[in-house]
Amino acid sequence: MTMRLLSLLLAAFLLAALPARAEVAYPLTVTDSLGREVTVPAEPKAVLLGSGFNLVALSLIHPDPVSLLAGWAGDMKGDNPEIYARFREKFPAIEDVPIIGDGVTVSFEAALSLKADLAILANWQADSDLGRQAIDYLERTGVPVVVVDFNNDALDNTADTMRLLGRVLNREEQANAFADFYDARIARIRERVAAHPEPGPTVLMDAFPNPEKCCYAYGTGGLGAFIAITGSRNIAESLPPQGGLVSIEFIVAANPEVYIATASPGGTYSGFSVGPGVDPEEARETLARAVESPFLASLKAVQDGRVHGLWNFFNAVPLNVLAAEAFARWLRPDIFSDVDPDETLKEINDRFAAVPFDGAYWISLKAN
């Protein structure tokens, strides 16, 4: 037997010994994030994304998520052009994917013309009148609609939502691996806080700080839940879960021990710039300017240097595990000194991400 033949036989043996990727059987009926039963007739090949941010979720379980798209909304491209640019560098075909809406509205005519076999909507879209109309329209034209939720109760729902996407898109192995990874890191935070029940600091989370007016504070929902998981206390917990406007007097009276600002790259809605593609020094400098106003500068949080910033759109993507770890490190450094979101991001990039995520997604006024 020649060496070439022996090598071929050995290669064939090794390939046969590898476990086959588990295949999903279609038609497939699933329960989506709104509790709706949805039947998907066949493996989706032409997907409509009601929110462009859900491309991030697809990119964690599929090596070429853009190849799945029949059409998508332009909200990620518009709100976070830097993260869009990263996808365009890796997958130039994204430039040719038709836009079907802006994340708030959906063009029914465009959706119908694209001959999609699945639509994925975000929970906040499906909860609106326009979203319900879109679901009804798409389903009447034969396009099944699956609703996903990375926003409401994200700490409890994100892993299950990834598993849902994995089943629907025939990527269960990859989705389950990410969900297990996510669950393990959230469990570490919960377990350690349970072992240290003493209360953490008081916190203000200020969405898109604006020197012209004050202030939109996160409540206990969305990213606000990431305060509570650390055992810390949100000064805006009496507001509706989504948060709301608060006055200077309210903040000064509460005098929070920690201040966290949220924003987007380029300071789209405020002067503070943080998120994909942002240099850490730019993020730190713009955060420093955001707390220069006299009333913020007088707060205990600012006086003590406990000022931090975070990419606001963590509330739309399964990367929110990074926000949870950043909050743990910032708010309870005494029990989370070994938790490092930078290392977690590196592992996500190495193990899961079709497009690596880079930039200053979180920042502290004081460099480590």
Task: Identify the residue ranges that each predicted region occupies.
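Short helix-initiation/N-cap motifs at beta->coil->alpha
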Residues: 33-35, 97-107, 239-247
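Structured C-terminal subdomain patch of bacterial secreted/periplasmic proteins
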Residues: 23, 153-167, 180, 268-368
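A short, structured surface patch at a secondary-structure boundary
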Residues: 55-113, 118, 122-126
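Pocket-lining segment of extracytoplasmic ligand-binding domains
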Residues: 235-249, 255-279
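Bacterial Sec-exported substrate-binding components of ABC uptake systems
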Residues: 18-57, 173-206, 336-368
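Bacterial N-terminal signal peptides
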Residues: 7-17
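Extracytoplasmic ligand-binding site segments that recognize negatively charged/polar headgroups
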Residues: 74-82, 123-133, 148-161, 197-224, ...
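Alpha-helical, coiled-coil/dimerization segments enriched in small aliphatic residues
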Residues: 216-242
